[in-house]
Amino acid sequence: MTDATPTLTPKPWISGIAPYVPGKSAGADGRPLIKLSANENPLGTGEKARAAFAAVQSAPDALSRYPDPGSVELRAAIAAKYGLDPDRVICGNGSDELLHLAAGTYAGPGDEILYVRYGFAVYEIAARRVGAVPVEADDRDFATDVDALLAAVTDRTRVVYLANPNNPTGTLATREEVGRLYAGLPQNVLFVIDQAYAEYLTPDEDDGGLELAKTRPNVFVTRTFSKIHGLAAERIGWGYASADVIAALHRIRLPFNVTRAGQAAAVAALGDDDFVNRSRAHNARWRAWLAAELESLGNHGVRVVPSATNFLLVLFEGAVSAETVYHRLMDAGYIVRWLPGQGIPQALRMTIGTEDETRGLATAIRAALAG
């Protein structure tokens, strides 16, 4: 008779999670590359945020003291900037933490979490992490299809994620579409509007998400300081929802989740309109330029998906594949994001870089297509 030795195993739904693969910054040989794979701000970080960050770091107790667990000053600054109630603002270790909190607070085994195909990769991870069933609704030519999302809602749906603008496609759902989606959802479903790229939009493009979150009990809007504010290294996100939703999220939020220096830098960043405006203008100019350059390569099977973000999704549907272009770009010193893991093996996602980086990328793509 043999005694069975118990084995430590993770929950089955954890084993089903494919590890998140971040954008690379170096080649396989360790050679530094021009990184256009993670949608970072090519202008860096604003002077005000850098000065505030440095001031905290230079304090004698910079490392020995815990940060403010409630991010009180930062929440007040966010509320003042956007006309919100500071008690209904929550800060996170990046907006990723807040997206996970939404799933962990409102869904569990047997529940369903819904999002559009080609949505942000974290949504599936957040769903599986809590044992919920991830459900993908069909897209409409890489854009959000509201009718498909509503058709996928069941009595087990507990959370609906909408990235707007969407990552990795760059597409934007209109205010009318977002309102129609919300109107079609049951009131026991949390509608999460992930606005990581909202600061790149013009006022006319605003999707009305914050207005919904101000007045509706089941809408949670998330934003980040990682993109236009250039604070990606500090991992700072924030969200807004009803008092009841925020109170529930706080029950499982980790204390001390945003660093002291990060909080100070974020407060300063909110007051640096000049840097934000310069970043937005730079992005609009060079996104349009790069899109036009790549659209001129249509005879090579190149197609650019219209973008409202700081990146382009580019389809390679001709003789030279996206995978081939990806590797040839690395050989030329550029790293972009190839997307087979998100079901788009024919596509590359390209961050808008500096002028020199963007011009160089266009030249390298032409060379890659020429073989």
From Swiss-Prot:
Its cofactor is pyridoxal 5'-phosphate. PANTHER family: HISTIDINOL-PHOSPHATE AMINOTRANSFERASE, HISTIDINOL-PHOSPHATE AMINOTRANSFERASE 2. Keywords: Amino-acid biosynthesis, Aminotransferase, Histidine biosynthesis, Pyridoxal phosphate, Transferase. It comes from Sphingopyxis alaskensis (strain DSM 13593 / LMG 18877 / RB2256). Belongs to the class-II pyridoxal-phosphate-dependent aminotransferase family. Histidinol-phosphate aminotransferase subfamily. GO terms for molecular function: histidinol-phosphate transaminase activity; pyridoxal phosphate binding. It comes from the Bacteria. Pathway: Amino-acid biosynthesis; L-histidine biosynthesis; L-histidine from 5-phospho-alpha-D-ribose 1-diphosphate: step 7/9. This is Histidinol-phosphate aminotransferase. InterPro entries: Aminotransferase_I/II_large, HisP_aminotrans, HistidinolP_aminotransfase, PyrdxlP-dep_Trfase, PyrdxlP-dep_Trfase_major, PyrdxlP-dep_Trfase_small. The lineage of its organism: Bacteria, Pseudomonadati, Pseudomonadota, Alphaproteobacteria, Sphingomonadales. Its EC number is 2.6.1.9. CDD domains: AAT_like. GO terms for biological process: L-histidine biosynthetic process. The gene is hisC. Gene3D superfamilies: Aspartate Aminotransferase, domain 1, Type I PLP-dependent aspartate aminotransferase-like (Major domain).
